[in-house]
Amino acid sequence: MKYLAVAGRQPLISLAEIQALYDKHAKLVGKNLIIFHLENQKPEINRLGGAMKLGELFEGDFKELVKHLNELRPEGKITVGISDFSKQRKAGFTFQKSMEIKRSLGKMGRSVRVITSKEPEIPSVTAHHNQLGEKPGCYEILVLDRELYLSLGTQNITAYTERDQVRPARDAKVGMLPPKLAQILINLCGPLPEGARILDPFCGTGVVLQEAAIMGYTPYGTDLSKRMIEYSKKNLSWLFNERNSKRFKIKPELIQKKDAILDKLAVGDATTFQWEGQIDAVAFESYLGAPMSKPPVDIKFKAEKAKCREIALGFLKNITPLIKSGTPIVMAIPAWLRETGKYARMNVLDKIQEMGYNFEKFQDLSQSDLLYFREGQIVAREIIVIRKR
């Protein structure tokens, strides 16, 4: 089956995520649209950190689509909206087609509510609040040139806000990993068996651990700071409580293992700690250095780079003998904005290869494309995806 993903603000990272998780031949078409194929399963919008919308190809025209919508929802009100992502878009096209659909369904005796937008695309916030593609009877049609895609849903901004800002233990001083980026890091590990044990050796307040649990994986974390381990335990306990375990669909078998999972969270230096048990994948944000409000001068930059490099490589050296061949490791390490306006990286790729790791290849992408940042951000995150030889 053919699918369309509407990527967020960093489409190349979203492309890598979809290639790793769903289809290694996924392609970027246009500025932020990704086409991919998947058999025997449906992609899930709430699984992807880098996609704003997701649609499944409908093999037919608008006339056939009207019949399909009528059959999908035999009774009750229908809500419909259209987003046009075509290369050549005509003014008023989405409104005109929406009205045609409303009239056609009206002739079939159906009550129809149309969601419109001043722009060719319905904003993600509007689509989410109207549950387009998520609630029975609520549809968004994604138009791409001559193809029509039926929405499978929009990124759930309400759930992200809750997982980011409502959880009980947060600490702005240590930096805050966005849940979306945590999802991306885990997904870049590729498909993993259900219940796979995912390690975050720099777990902080537990964002990667939280997102791993929501995906059905067993979270395992350590951190140098005792306070961070306490925060991770509080946040996972919050996630596993009766309300949130239902809200975020935590698997019952994980809830049953809650106490064992919390007990395994430990204080430990990632460069020396000896982790117990099987580790199926590793996903983490490494130490990013001191917070900065402007590009660092050379002396400061060199000192921060040396410290961050020592920690990241020290961890890899430590964990290499503890994991099996083929184990994926996905890490976000710092890159610093310089006065030139470009980011300077840690330059650890050759060293990582010497340690016995292969770099995952992504079609039409290079390592320089995997830089996660916001406009003007001083410390960006370079994402590195490797697998033990």
Residues of each region from the PLM?
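Mobile active-site "lid"/loop adjacent to the S-adenosyl-L-methionine
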Residues: 226-228, 242, 247-249, 284-314
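Non-catalytic nucleic-acid substrate-recognition regions in nucleic-acid-modifying enzymes
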Residues: 6-9, 14-139
